[in-house]
Structures are given as structure tokens and as C-alpha cells.
Amino acid sequence: MKTLLLLVGLLLTLENGQVLGDKAVSDRELQEMSTQGSNYINKEIKNALKGVKQIKNLIEQTNEERKSLLGTLEEAKKKKEGALNDTKDSEMKLKESQGVCNETMTALWEECKPCLKQTCMKFYARVCRSGSGLVGHQLEEFLNQSSPFYFWINGDRIDSLLENDRQQTHVLDVMQDSFDRASSIMDELFQDRFFTREPQDTYYYSPFSSPHRRSSLLFNPKSRFARNIMHFPMYRHLNFNDMFQPFFDMIHQAQQAMNLHLHRLPDQLPMTEFSEGDNHDRTVCKEIRHNSTGCLKMKDQCEKCQEILSVDCSTNNPSQMQLRQELNNSLQLAEKFTKLYDELLQSYQEKMLNTSSLLKQLNEQFSWVSQLANLTQGEDQYYLQVTTVSSHNSDSEVPSGLTRVVVKLFDSYPITVTVPEVVSRNNPKFMETVAEKALQEYRQKNREE
């Protein structure tokens, strides 16, 4: 008898599988909840698309800053190249008279080489560590083949400047190629009427609007972008996926184009020998391994090497000293402009990385809407549909003091959320809380996938 009474009691409290305490939730109430939740989701979609426009504006602003910086780079490049040309001209003129003082410099060079080798190998063993034996043999050959005149005119500094110029040109070319590829995609994307409407136009999409109004707001049928994605007559119904997936695909393509080429950049920009600390040491290690020229940077630590730099040949050839002074002046100027160019290049790279970061934000901001669009294949009018509402009184598995709500976002998997019972079902905040939690879980799962 007790069992029978219990069954009767359960039957009285059940209706279509939805329960809440002693009062069943009717189909009409579930529909009202679904409508309230759908309104919240609709608002979040609008906010997401507003966010897309805001990020688009930031990308355009960053691009304007990039263009301005590029102009400054071009001016600095002209000054740098002018100084480099003057340096090479002075070097050529000096080489024509290198026989002067050759005997004095050669004698000093023979005393300079052992000190230079010892100082360099100590540095390499302490800082660079790997492959000291091979580097020592390579350095021996380099010093034997080098001339004291090359040392006297600071040939290592000239070679470093020319190599930096080559690397800087390469870095800028890579960044420009990267941006041009991404920019062509973004230009096509941002020219669509979806992005060109005024900010106050907050009407983007609603499941309750007519297909005609929806298509006229989002697409300019004359644009190439619209023609590419609208292979069907304008009067046909546009589903959510048809409208948003192409945007997402193009944003993803732009981000890939940007990142692919930025990854080709060196870990650090070329003009690092003027910097201090670990970066400088790593650069010297690299130069020593490459062709031993990094060792010449240690000439200040060897007395005989310093004496070579102090040799005065003006007695035998007054014009040579003047040429050397001109070389040193143009060399210092070239180093100054090369350093300035490198600083501007780093700023330019930061702008590029900012654009890449904004594209990533654009991707993340838009991806959940786009992924959600893949689920909107049915004719259901609700974004969010409430299927079950229960509490501890009706389901012992529900923790005390909580209301459990099972919902579906479009055709997605069921999502279960809990709401404190202090927020009653009649409270306007109830379904807002449910929808917010459901959307958070959906976004989280979408990111993990």
C-alpha cells in the first residue's frame, strides 16, 4: 500500500518529465523560459558582432599607425644608405694607399694576434661554450688571412654594418609580405556592408526577423565578397551559417597569413651589437661561430691591437689620414642611422604583432558565433530551449538549495546549469542566469575543441 501511494504521489508531481518542487512546469512556462533565454542569447550575439566591429576599427587604426611608421622607416633608410655609401667610398680610397705604414702595422699585428686569439677563446669558452676546438682552428685561419690594414680601417665594423643592412632589408620584406597577404583578405572582408554600417545600427540578426530584411542588412549583392558566398537567389532564406561562416573563414585566413610570415622572422632583429647584456653576448657568439669576426670586437682588451689603431701615417701620406678621418666619421654616422633604423624596425614589428594579436581576438570573438551557426540547421525559433527544470524536492540528485535546468543551444548537446533557489523561476534574473551559464559552458567547450 505504501508503495502504491508513493507511485501515485510521483505521478501527480510529474508532467512531461519537468518538475520543480511540488508544482509541475507546464509546456507554456517552458516556452516562456525558452523565449527569455533566447532573448539573452540574441543580445549576446549582437554584443559579439559589435565587438567584431570594434576590433575591426582597432585594426584599421593600427594599420594607419603602421603606414606612418613605414614612412619614417623609409626616411631613416635613405639616411642609413647614404652613410653606408660614404663609408664604402672612403674605404675604397684608403685601400688604394694601403702600402703606407704597412711595415709598422704588420709588426704590431703579429703581436696583436696571440692576445686577440687568447682573449676571444676565453670569452667563447665562458659564454658560448659549445665547439671551442673547431672555433679555435677557424679563428687561427681567420687571423692569419686578415691584414693589419683591414684592422686599421675598422673593417669588421664596416662588414657588420653591411650584414645588418642585408638582414634589416630581409626582415622588413618579410613583414611587408605578411601584412600585404593579410591585408588583401581584410580589405575584402571589411568592405562588406556588414562592417560599413553605422555603429548605432545594433540590429544584426534575429531569429524572429524576416529573411528579406536580414539579407538586405548584411550583404551588398554587388560586392565580390557577397557574390562569392551567395550562390543562391536573394529571396531565398539565409540560415545563420550562410551568413557568418564566410566571415569566420576569412578572419582565420588573415590570421594564418600574418602568423605564417611573422614566424619566419629571426628571434632578434639584426642591430644587436649595439645593445648590452645577454643579447650582445649571443650575437658575438654567433659571429665567432660564423666567421670569427666577433673576435675583433675584443681588440680593446689587447694593447698591441690598440697600437695598430693609433698608427699615424700622415708623415708619409697626409691625405691618407684625412681619408681615415672621413671613414671614421661616415662609419659613426652609418652606425647611428643603422641603430635608429633598427629601433624603428622593432616598433614596426610591434605594430605587426599587435595586428596579429587583434586578428586573434577577432577570431576568438567571432568563432563561437560561427561555430554556433553550424548548429542552426533546424526550423526551431528558439536560440535556447529549456527541456527540464528540477529541484532537490523532486530529484534527490539535485543539491539542496539549487534549481537544476537542462537547456539546448540550437541543436547542441544538452547543457545542465544550476541556479540558487533564492532566484525564483518568476524572477527576471532566473533565465538570464541560466542562459549566461549555458553560454559560458558552450564557449568553454568550444575553446577546448
Swiss-Prot record:
Q: Which residues carry this modification: Phosphoserine?
A: 132, 396
Q: Which residues are glycosylated?
A: 85, 102, 144, 291, 328, 354, 374
- Which Cys pairs does UniProt list as disulfide-bonded? 101-313, 112-305, 115-302, 120-295, 128-285
Keyword Transmembrane belongs to the record:
no
Return the motif ranges for Nuclear localization signal.
77-80, 443-447
Annotated GO molecular function terms are: misfolded protein binding; ubiquitin protein ligase binding; unfolded protein binding
Locations listed in the record: Secreted; Nucleus; Cytoplasm; Mitochondrion membrane
Q: Which residues form the signal peptide?
A: 1-21
Q: Which GO terms describe its biological process?
A: chaperone-mediated protein folding; immune complex clearance; intrinsic apoptotic signaling pathway; negative regulation of amyloid fibril formation; negative regulation of intrinsic apoptotic signaling pathway in response to DNA damage; negative regulation of protein-containing complex assembly; positive regulation of apoptotic process; positive regulation of intrinsic apoptotic signaling pathway
Pfam family membership, one: Clusterin
Q: Does the keyword Amino-acid biosynthesis apply?
A: no
Topology relative to the lipid bilayer, per the entry, is: Peripheral membrane protein
Main location per UniProt? secreted
Q: Name one GO cellular component term.
A: cytoplasm
UniProt keyword annotations, A-Z: Chaperone, Cytoplasm, Cytoplasmic vesicle, Disulfide bond, Endoplasmic reticulum, Glycoprotein, Membrane, Microsome, Mitochondrion, Nucleus, Phosphoprotein, Secreted, Signal, Ubl conjugation
* PTM (free text): Proteolytically cleaved on its way through the secretory system, probably within the Golgi lumen. Proteolytic cleavage is not necessary for its chaperone activity. All non-secreted forms are not proteolytically cleaved. Chaperone activity of uncleaved forms is dependent on a non-reducing environment. Polyubiquitinated, leading to proteasomal degradation. Under cellular stress, the intracellular level of cleaved form is reduced due to proteasomal degradation.
Quote the function comment for this protein: Functions as extracellular chaperone that prevents aggregation of non native proteins. Prevents stress-induced aggregation of blood plasma proteins. Inhibits formation of amyloid fibrils by APP, APOC2, B2M, CALCA, CSN3, SNCA and aggregation-prone LYZ variants (in vitro). Does not require ATP. Maintains partially unfolded proteins in a state appropriate for subsequent refolding by other chaperones, such as HSPA8/HSC70. Does not refold proteins by itself.
The similarity comment for this entry is: Belongs to the clusterin family.
- The protein's assembly and partners: Antiparallel disulfide-linked heterodimer of an alpha chain and a beta chain. Self-associates and forms higher oligomers. Interacts with a broad range of misfolded proteins, including APP, APOC2 and LYZ. Slightly acidic pH promotes interaction with misfolded proteins. Forms high-molecular weight oligomers upon interaction with misfolded proteins. Interacts with APOA1, LRP2, CLUAP1 and PON1. Interacts with the complement membrane attack complex. Interacts (via alpha chain) with XRCC6.
What PANTHER family is this protein classified in?
A: CLUSTERIN
Protein name (record): Clusterin
Gene (name only): CLU
